[in-house]
Amino acid sequence: MVGAIWSMPPKDVMDYPIISLFNFFNNHKLLHSKNDRPKWLTVSNGSIQYVSKIIRFLDANPRVKTYKNINITEIKRKNNSITVKDSNNNENQFDHIIFATNPTKILEIVKDTDEKEKNILSSFSTNKNTAYLHNDKSLMPSLREVWSSWNVHIPKKKVDYISVTYWMNRLQNINNSKPLFLSLNPSKLPKEKSIFKIIDYEHPIFDLGSIDSKKQLPKIQGHRNTWYCGAWSGNGFHEDGINSSVELAKKFGIKILWE
């Protein structure tokens, strides 16, 4: 279950702190009786809905300039000025920078991390996972009656990955007349003609080192005009990404529209 929830390989599951695990299970009432469990809600048609809405909101603001699909290759900081260089060798200067990506990516592009930053950020690691969007029903349980939103497959032979198939019709309120599934690290590949898209992901790995470094993160927030947010700074979910960005916005004195 731990591997399925956090998309972690079996070899890393045993490094997940047991106290953090029990707290998570308790907060989500995963161990409660069926009648005491919360009714979970999802965003119809997926997270792209709120991502697109945020982009439209920013694009409509004349004070905001957005750059999309640009590969950042290097970031340097000097005298409270931050230089951002992209793959086309364009450089732009900024007063502050906010990283909304995982620490492994940050360490790749920031060339001047000091010892304090490096010690905290290097404690975080990620696991690569491949997802297949498809309509091959053979990757779902053979009994239609037991189809669930999340379907974990445990192969008979020992493997170093977790295989989960998500029933997208149920998760994102998609018409059942056209079956749609997302299989993460499938133990067998979907039929070639059934595949719509292949997506590579990197999910955070949570162990004692990263849990401790999350507590240390406030020590480098704002250090050298550099800030951090993202799901990795919480429990790895979309809500954690939003919560961390809201808390960061408050530090800049930004009014939260729904508060």
Show where each model-derived region lies:
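Mid-domain catalytic core of redox enzymes
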Residues: 73-202
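Active-site/ligand-binding neighborhood in enzyme catalytic cores
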Residues: 1-73
